[in-house]
Design a protein with these regions (language model features):
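Selective transmembrane-helix segments that form parts of the transport pathway or gating/packing helices
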Residues: 24, 64-65, 96-123, 338
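Long, hydrophobic alpha-helical segments
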Residues: 57-79, 114
């Protein structure tokens, strides 16, 4: 272990001496320190200003450190091989796999230090912005919706199976299922289920619905504890900028102590909105009941998607949420380090950097690429939009995207900006999947190639 750590210390010193590393560090520090004075958000609320700063700063840290990691991991081995400096190491009594592991440890240790320093600057700048003067409602929104950690509970979905069975029974009695195959009947059942689910999430003009949010772990007796109803209404006609007028009341009608006053409000469709609710509206079973009515004259409103209507409640503090987000970013950097080092064992620096950048871009856009590949498939008997290349390229692209880790699976920056919890499960998943499995596999392959290769061999 002492040999690995010696190589790691040498790698850190080498990275600090590298001009490109210093440039990245200076640029990142300058931007992080200047952003608090330049971001404006929506130009009205301090909440929006803090959210804009967190989004830009954390996104910038992840982007710049990813670039720095790719450059350092692809250049440290490749440059030593190209400049023949590796021969001085090869003659020493240290196995090549330990040399490879020391390189990885040095780069990820430097990344960890830079992440901690960046996190401290982000936290300090956020604290500075928090102290800026603003009006009371904006201050409350900042504390309750950004500088906190909230867990989201989705609407409790009722059991539609009895209603589906009744509809199927009527169709069978009418003889409309007699000549239909088993798969066709299954499709009919799924369509009915989706129709009922959509209707349950739909509010016609003048119509009201009762929704419930269960398992809310809040202190009902504390008047300072509040929840937020987080929702995104949509117009069933797909029209933008429609004003949704709603009337709602929170509380359990079987427990008058939980009933809150009736409220009304206007909300623009296709945008997320948050409405504060006192914790006293939650009943003894930890359930929040909501009755909401559409008082818009003509428009039908739909809450589409699993995240279109949630109840949020606080469970922690901002700084630990920030630390978890930085931990996930570090796991991604550790994977990129292993990838860059493995590529540089048999490729020259430009080619290794190009390959690593390609995988970084695919990993970042993995979710979008998967949807794009699926969308490029022909529908039914329609001609293939990719002509004769489609049957060949789509499977290859699907396999490539499947092999590359999906960085878009988790959004730690978005959760920090929205005051949402960065789950510990995300951190564990990133650590296991990116570092202990995929990173370890790349490290073993890279160490094996580096051990077997002829150092004097020319790489391209």
């Amino acid at each position: 272990m002492s040999r690995i750590w010696a190589v790691a210390r040498h790698t850190i010193a080498e990275c600090i001496r590298t001009r490109i590393a210093v440039v990245f560090i200076v640029v990142m520090a300058a931007i992080l320190l200047s952003l608090p004075f330049s971001v404006a958000g929506d130009g009205v609320t301090l909440k929006s200003r803090v959210q804009s700063y967190l989004s830009y700063s954390l996104g910038l840290v992840a982007f710049l450190l990813s670039l720095l990691t790719v450059f350092l991991s692809c250049s440290t081995l490749a440059s030593e091989i190209r400049l023949r400096q590796i021969f001085m190491i090869a003659c020493k009594p240290i196995p090549r796999w330990q040399f490879f592991a020391g390189k990885w440890l040095g780069i990820v240790a430097m990344d960890a230090g830079l992440l901690l320093a960046s996190g401290a600057m982000v936290w300090g700048a956020t604290w500075y912005l928090q102290t800026r003067p603003t009006y009371d409602e904006d201050r409350k929104a900042l504390d309750a919706e950004v500088l906190t950690v909230r867990h989201g509970v989705k609407i409790g979905v009722p059991d539609f199976n009895p209603m589906v069975d009744e509809r199927i029974r009527k169709l069978r009695e009418e003889g409309r299922l007699n000549d239909m195959s088993l798969s066709g009947r299954r499709t009919i059942r799924d369509d009915i289920q989706e129709e009922l689910r959509t209707g349950w999430r739909m509010l016609k003009p003048g119509e009201y619905k009762d929704y419930t949010f269960g398992h809310l772990l809040v202190d009902r007796e504390d008047p300072k504890v509040w929840l937020q109803l987080h929702f995104k209404p949509r117009s069933s006609a797909g029209v933008e900028d429609v004003i949704f007028k709603a009337r709602w009341q929170c509380g359990d009608r079987d427990d008058v102590n939980t009933l809150m006053p009736v409220q009304e409000g206007e909300f623009i469709v296709n945008r997320f909105h948050e409405v504060p609710v006192p914790a006293a509206a939650v009943n003894k079973e930890g359930v929040l009941r909501l009755r909401i009515q559409n008082i818009t004259d003509h428009d039908t409103i739909v809450f589409e998607g699993s995240d279109s209507f949630e109840a949020l409640y606080g469970i922690g503090t901002f700084h630990w949420n920030l630390f978890r987000a930085l931990s996930i970013i570090w796991c991604r950097l550790a994977f990129l380090t292993a990838l860059g080092l493995a590529a540089s064992t048999f490729l020259s620096f430009p080619v290794a950097a190009m390959v690593t950048f390609l995988i970084l871009m695919v990993a970042t856009a993995s979710g979008f690429l998967s949807e794009a590949i699926a969308g490029a498939a022909p529908a039914g008997t329609a001609p293939d939009p990719m002509w004769f290349l489609g049957p060949v390229l789509r499977p290859l692209a699907s396999v490539f995207v499947m092999l590359v880790p999906d960085f878009s699976k988790f959004d730690p920056v978005g959760n920090v900006v929205g005051g949402r919890v960065v789950p510990l499960l995300w951190v564990i998943d990133s650590m296991v999947r990116l570092v202990l499995i995929q990173g370890l596999i790349l490290g073993l392959l890279g160490a094996a190639v580096f051990t077997k290769r002829e150092l004097a061999q020319v790489t391209v």
